[in-house]
């Protein structure tokens, strides 16, 4: 995914007894596996896909046990999808979780918050913030990223930080149904023709 040599995501947790070379380290990002899944679907002639995964990343922490933050990753390609399709999915998810007031900032290929930023097209990706806290990154994958995975069409991906999202989520409060159901009434108002509707609405409210 075009990570620079000094990327913190290259600092991995090594497994003592791996099943094979491909599984010898713990993943530090969900994005590579999502790209592999999209590549597999593309090579099997699936015209379009829209996928997601929830899982943990494993980040080294000195001599201690690694951190295991929960993440969510999305991936999609197909003629019906574009940058705004991915943005719409994220907006719907945030709305469902009760996260209001999220802000979107352009990402220029580098990011202090997400090591995966080089994987995205520098002019077609954005970071998601809530109250100044970065909760996600999404956009169109860089042509070199697509070439590395053998994906011959434009593809889009997103990564979201679940702990930060849940911290920003508004807890919903449920109330019992009213004992007496509401009723709807139609009102007929007699007035002069020169009275604006806005004045009537203001008087009613």
Regions found by a protein language model. Give the residues of each.
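Extended beta-strand-rich architecture
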Residues: 1-205
